[in-house]
Curated annotation (Swiss-Prot):
PROSITE patterns named among the record's database cross-references: G_TR_1, G_TR_2
Source organism per UniProt: Methylorubrum populi (strain ATCC BAA-705 / NCIMB 13946 / BJ001) (Methylobacterium populi)
UniProt protein name: Sulfate adenylyltransferase subunit 1
Chain spans, region G3: 110-113
G2: annotated span: 89-93
CDD domains named in the record: CysN_ATPS (cd04166), CysN_NodQ_II (cd03695), CysN_NoDQ_III (cd04095)
EC numbers: 2.7.7.4
Pathway per the UniProt entry: Sulfur metabolism; hydrogen sulfide biosynthesis; sulfite from sulfate: step 1/3
Function: With CysD forms the ATP sulfurylase (ATPS) that catalyzes the adenylation of sulfate producing adenosine 5'-phosphosulfate (APS) and diphosphate, the first enzymatic step in sulfur assimilation pathway. APS synthesis involves the formation of a high-energy phosphoric-sulfuric acid anhydride bond driven by GTP hydrolysis by CysN coupled to ATP hydrolysis by CysD.
Length: 470
């Protein structure tokens, strides 16, 4: 069977026409160092025929220089792109790869396993729908396996594929497989996963990755790829209320005025009643404008321009939401932080908080507790160090519109930015929202916003991806 193909034989136009309307699933691979995360992704790319001839030639050359599989091709090198990663044989940065099957398109994030790169792992998990947690069958559950399972839970990923790798090195022992699964289920019981699917596999040999293996006669489940093709994630996302942070006001002439942005959640159609935060003004959607023409309905992930039936004052930083479930306005946030800066975080610290498309001034009012990344237990704390996870209260200089993270991952998350370096210092998840009692603080003018925002903005997702080089 031909695994790779030439660009000419591939057919780009046909590929784009076929795959542009497919459902996209984002997932991450995580686990301890050397559990085989990069090899697994390489195997997925290889066996789904996503590799071109020139890539195969380069892979063979790189395998001779940097490979860890002896004379065999090292599939991990398809993902480990940094020179330091190849020289050390580990993953440091978060590597994103795309592949597609007849059923779905996939965006996979290969996250680092070393503890000092946990902040990078949180970057990859922040946008994922499913987590593939790898476990080396020889070693079982490790400290970093538990840490990553906890991080996955804290970041709101509810479905886990427990990929028990290197089963060929333990003779495909069912007893070993059952022991690892039992241990993980016991640890994960309080983490509120809706599903844990355990799959025995060998990423190096390809058993139970894309195609079913024959060695584990006792396993009657599906391969990993089939699980990823069938897991019903998007149906859960569609239940979220409509939210669209305004990126800019589109006014090419005096006859047209619309609000442009990326729909963060839910869907919208002409005639829907909406509320604009923080002003609280209400209106209805008159048009959904795009470069390809008007739409009858737009959904999560689409970039559109909404034209409202009424003249509503709004600018960058505002959020348009369904009137049936408006956002809460607040100037005080209880957040769970993934602290990434080398300097400690203590009460009184002043940072920028970027929420959606709006940047506000934030002061740490209190550090309440630190979360043990291995047990999930909380303990009292008065500061957070690098890689710590903890609960803090932030005081903001104006009211913003947010949701709790458990209700909406987009409008319930933020990043904290160091004022001096403009580096991303933390990823924050809004825990509880208490409505402000004072009058709404007017949104800053465009010139004020430009003066206050750090030079390196680019949106929440771009900021998250900058999380210490992520």
């Amino acid at each position: 069977m031909t695994i790779h193909q030439s660009p000419e034989a591939f057919g780009y136009d046909a590929f784009l026409r076929t795959h542009q309307s497919k459902e996209v699933l984002r997932f991450i691979t995580c686990g301890s160092v050397d559990d085989g995360k990069s090899t697994l992704i390489g195997r997925l790319l290889h066996d789904t025929k996503q590799i071109f001839d020139d890539q195969v030639t380069a892979l063979q050359r790189d395998s001779r220089k940097h490979g860890t599989q002896g004379a065999e091709v090292d599939l991990a090198l398809l993902v480990d792109g940094l020179q330091a990663e190849r020289e050390q044989g580990i993953t440091i940065d978060v590597a994103y790869r795309f592949f597609s099957t007849d059923r779905r398109s996939f965006i996979v994030a290969d996250t680092p396993g070393h503890e000092q790169y946990t902040r990078n792992m949180a970057t990859g998990a922040s946008t994922a729908d499913v987590a593939v947690i790898l476990v080396d069958a020889r070693h079982g559950l490790t400290r970093q396996t538990r840490r990553h399972a906890l991080l996955v839970s804290l970041l709101g990923i509810h479905r886990v594929a427990l990929a028990i790798n290197k089963m060929d090195l333990v003779g495909w022992s069912q007893d070993k497989f059952d022991a690892i699964l039992s241990g993980f289920q016991a640890f994960a019981a309080p983490l509120n996963f809706s599903e844990v699917r355990a799959i025995p596999l060998s990423a190096k040999n390809g058993d139970n990755v894309v195609l079913p293996g024959t060695a584990a006669t006792w396993y009657d489940g599906v391969p990993l790829l089939r699980y990823l093709e069938e897991v019903p994630v998007k149906s859960e996302e569609r239940a979220a209320a409509f939210r669209m942070p305004v990126q800019w006001v589109n006014r090419p002439n005096s006859d047209f005025r619309g609000f442009s942005g990326l729909i963060a959640s839910g869907s919208v159609a002409p005639g829907d009643a909406v509320t604009v935060a923080p002003s609280g003004k209400t209106s209805t959607v008159a048009r959904i404008f795009t470069a390809d023409g008007d739409l009858e309905r737009a959904s999560e992930g689409q970039s559109v321009t909404l034209v409202l039936a009424d003249e509503v004052d709004a600018s960058r930083g505002a959020v348009i939401a369904t009137s049936d479930a408006p956002l809460t306005l607040t100037d005080s946030l209880d957040v769970r932080l993934f602290w990434a800066a080398e300097t400690d975080l203590a009460p009184g610290a002043s940072l920028w908080a970027k929420v959606g498309t709006q940047t506000v001034n934030a002061v740490v009012k209190a550090v309440h507790r630190r979360i043990d990344p291995e047990t999930g237990q909380a303990g009292p704390a008065d500061k957070l160090a690098v890689n710590d996870i903890g609960d803090v209260t932030l005081t903001l200089d104006r009211q913003i519109a947010v949701d709790p993270y458990v209700e909406n991952r987009d409008t319930g998350s933020l990043i904290l930015i160091d004022r001096e370096t403009t580096d991303t210092a933390a990823l924050g998840l809004v825990q509880t929202v208490v409505a402000a009692t004072k009058a709404v603080t007017p949104a800053p003018t465009a010139s004020e916003s430009k003066a206050q925002e750090p030079a390196r903005s680019g949106g929440l997702l771009a900021g998250i991806k900058r999380l210490f080089g992520g």
